[in-house]
Amino acid sequence: MSVKSTRARRVSSDTELTESFEHNWMFDFKIKRPFYFNPKHREFYDCIKHSKTKMGFVDGPAGSMKTYIAVYAGLELIKQEKFQRLVYIRSVTESAERSLGSLPGEVDDKFSPYAIPLQEKITEITNGGTYTMLKQKGVVEAIPVNFVRGLTFNKALVIVDEAQNLSRKELTTILTRFGRDSRYIVLGD
């Protein structure tokens, strides 16, 4: 890992020193260069990165790199400290005709299978172990749509994945959680 250089400044307490140190290490991860962006990919990427973008809606066929590009741009924006966290929201709709039934465990355990696309993309874009580190530090959050009500996403890049599986009421609930200095990217097939 490389150490991020910062300007020297006076620190008034041990707490402030600890917070400053943790902040500098929080964004210290490497992002690999993308393998190929065609013109449509580049247009989507540029839209996410543009400072005036507050909300973007993207639809495209399965496998067209929508989630990959959104996560890639999101990690870059976090590394540049434009946002403090990346929030991944997804419906818990299963794609099979038959349900697996209730899963055992806590909410994180139950939702973790639905967060696999986020985990895979972060692992592919960065080095191994980055997803776990970012999740533990609260920089990356995966939230089921069922738990969005009452939250406000400040200083966050919010990726709403598989939006075609959301009801109008669920989408409205998600989009009304918009907070200060946030950006929404809604992806669907």
What kind of region is each of these model predictions?
Residues 1-23:
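Interdomain "pre-motor" coupling segment immediately N-terminal to P-loop NTPase/helicase cores
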Residues 56-137:
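Conserved P-loop
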Residues 22-33:
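Conserved adenine-nucleotide phosphate-binding loops and their immediately adjacent elements
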Residues 119-127, 172-185:
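Conserved catalytic/switch belt of AAA+ P-loop NTPases
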Residues 159-161, 183-189:
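Structural recognition of the conserved hydrophobic beta-strand(s) that form the central parallel beta-sheet
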Residues 33-52:
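N-terminal pre-P-loop "Q-motif" helix
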Residues 136-173:
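Conserved RecA-like ASCE ATPase "motif II neighborhood" in helicase/translocase motors
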Residues 51-56, 155:
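Pre-Walker A (Motif I) flank of P-loop NTPase domains
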